């Protein structure tokens, strides 16, 4: 069974890590992909590797609603429908609240929460009209448990889970046939830790990430959720290294 083939999938944060690995796997399974990220040069390289016929790209900063809307419009204009949106873009600067890193707080809120909301708001009219769709939001194990030094990041990921569950209930009530999935990774080997400016926190996180799993593990979970029959919905995954205790 391959329910991924020919589905039109939009992915934010597609230029590296989980996003890029998801592109690789879904393209192997025949999906048509629309990729958004701030680094257009990286997207162009991915497009060349995967193939122009099945991949469209759009420079996208998820903190800007107009750019998110343009990404969704590109998907519809190029392929005529939108089957899946994967809200993957995210940031994880870490610090204790007393450090008062307000710029980093705002960055996390803008990308991790508002970016997800902008994606949902942009794609819902298309999915409602076609009476089908699937929205996959990347949360985190930090959306299930709070760590010292991670209060704001955890807050953003708890918010992603709450928003996605609210969306699931609202779409079930109206019978739109729109599926939702929350995917909560643990330590994954990506660029996510590069944004940590606090030296003490960076050292602790780097220690945790010594046993990080590869991003293709998350890509496989995404592929699984999309591949499920339309009448069933995989609502939530937690995927972390076997050795990760938290």
Curated annotation (Swiss-Prot):
Highest taxon, organism lineage = Bacteria
Q: Name one Pfam family in it.
A: adh_short
Q: Which family does it belong to?
A: Belongs to the short-chain dehydrogenases/reductases (SDR) family.
Q: Could you identify this protein by its name?
A: Uncharacterized oxidoreductase SSP1627
SUPFAM superfamilies from the entry? NAD(P)-binding Rossmann-fold domains (SSF51735)
Q: What is the lineage of its organism?
A: Bacteria, Bacillati, Bacillota, Bacilli, Bacillales
Q: Does the keyword Transmembrane helix apply?
A: no
Task: Detail which positions bind NADP(+).
Answer: 10-34
Q: Which UniProt keywords apply?
A: Oxidoreductase
Which organism does this sequence originate in?
Staphylococcus saprophyticus subsp. saprophyticus (strain ATCC 15305 / DSM 20229 / NCIMB 8711 / NCTC 7292 / S-41)
Which residue positions are annotated as catalytic? 153
Question: Which InterPro entries does this UniProt record tie to the protein?
Answer: NAD(P)-bd_dom_sf, Sc_DH/Rdtase_CS, SDR_fam
